[in-house]
């Protein structure tokens, strides 16, 4: 594969939206000795371009976490019709990864740093029997959950806070301050849907918050416990990290000046 030589006058920047099933991967990011979504995608894109292609993602999902709408950018001197980046790449990708859209954007765009908001959805099944058809694609608890108590706790997390109690010990962010703009919880019979929106997320932040909400939903702690965790800023006091199975990166928001499509997907509940 021919490595690219950087000259901004000959390079074009392409933005791609893609979906993937994270069950077979060690996460988004390339890592030695394991199969990642990023490595699969870059290999397929390089096949289309005939040159080495590298991508930058809006968010780095963990092992087992899925995406309904991940956003990446790439830079290349190879000219291809936008549809070729979609269909040509999909022809070289495994069935659990698919390019949805392709757009050309100005050189100063960055998939990660230009993003103003990210949205995650978590689908959680609450019933005695574990899921079969949706195994690995939906979270599960065998006990009932109190929707109202979880909603009360969720409201305490909205706003700008220090989320140290909900960050992984491996988190590399220099600050735990984040702006959580939305945390909606809805119930559809036995299925609970959690929607998290923030300017950015800490490592394991969504799954750690979810673990706390589930503790509150089953009656182990009152809703006010969430406020205490925020104040204490101590990860060891919070609930364990919840399963990745039902977690989906579902959208990334960018300023209108980039003239990009709306990268936000809400998957109907009957085709999770």
From Swiss-Prot:
UniProt xrefs under SUPFAM superfamilies: Pseudouridine synthase
Annotated catalytic residues: 62 (nucleophile)
EC numbers, comma separated: 5.4.99.12
Cystine residue pairs: none
Reaction(s) catalysed (UniProt annotation): uridine(38/39/40) in tRNA = pseudouridine(38/39/40) in tRNA
GO MF entry, a single one: tRNA pseudouridine(38-40) synthase activity
Organism superkingdom: Bacteria
GO BP field: tRNA pseudouridine synthesis
Residues that hold substrate according to the record: 120
Pfam families found in the cross-reference section: PseudoU_synth_1
Isomerase keyword on record: yes
Entry keyword annotation includes Oxidoreductase: no
CDD domains: PseudoU_synth_EcTruA
Keywords from the UniProt entry: Isomerase, tRNA processing
NCBIfam families, alphabetized: hisT_truA
Subunit-structure text: Homodimer.
Family: Belongs to the tRNA pseudouridine synthase TruA family.
HAMAP family named in the record: TruA (MF_00171)
Role according to the record: Formation of pseudouridine at positions 38, 39 and 40 in the anticodon stem and loop of transfer RNAs.
Record's protein name: tRNA pseudouridine synthase A
Organism whose genome encodes this protein: Nitrosomonas europaea (strain ATCC 19718 / CIP 103999 / KCTC 2705 / NBRC 14298)
